[in-house]
Amino acid sequence: MLKRSLLFLTVLLLLFSFSSITNEVSASSSFDKGKYKKGDDASYFEPTGPYLMVNVTGVDGKRNELLSPRYVEFPIKPGTTLTKEKIEYYVEWALDATAYKEFRVVELDPSAKIEVTYYDKNKKKEETKSFPITEKGFVVPDLSEHIKNPGFNLITKVVIEKK
């Protein structure tokens, strides 16, 4: 009876000692929300539906690079019109993400355009559509039958100046 009691106590002690180790490990590797600020990987969410990805380089009038902000994604809706004014507004937001209220957009590169690439189910091949940036703008097409989250990409140089 004594051997059985000692064996039971030994197993019980081992069980408790391992549970305290595993609790410490899980507590130390838990996610600490206080360490992350808005915009870090912890707060990134993939946009649902179409989005405009703005990836620009800010240059001065002589084409010298002033600012290279990170890219920013903005949700857009099919059927809405993206004019030059709206696109400049999005570009200014992208600039503000790096240097808040320091720069303003003077002009977009004349060759700037917005592109979207997707697999066309009807043609059974990859398609790339380009849309010029004009005052009149273009209507965002509904590509939901081909792709779930189409990314409309603006990758260009933008002439900027200090505010």
Swiss-Prot record:
Can you list the GO cellular component terms from the UniProt entry? Answer: extracellular region
Q: Which Pfam families match?
A: Staphylokinase (PF02821)
Annotated Gene3D superfamilies: 3.10.20.130
Q: Which domain of life is it from?
A: Viruses
Mostly located where? secreted
Instruction: Check the record and name the SUPFAM superfamilies matching this protein.
Output: Staphylokinase/streptokinase (SSF54328)
Which locations, inside or outside the cell, does it occupy? Secreted
Q: Which residues form the signal peptide?
A: 1-27
Which keywords annotate this record?
Plasminogen activation, Secreted, Signal
Q: What does this protein do?
A: Potent plasminogen activator that converts plasminogen into plasmin. It forms a 1:1 complex with plasmin, which in turn activates other plasminogen molecules.
Which family does the record assign? Answer: Belongs to the staphylokinase family.
The name on file for this protein is Staphylokinase
Q: Which organism is it from?
A: Staphylococcus phage 42D (Bacteriophage P42D)
Lineage runs: Viruses, Duplodnaviria, Heunggongvirae, Uroviricota, Caudoviricetes
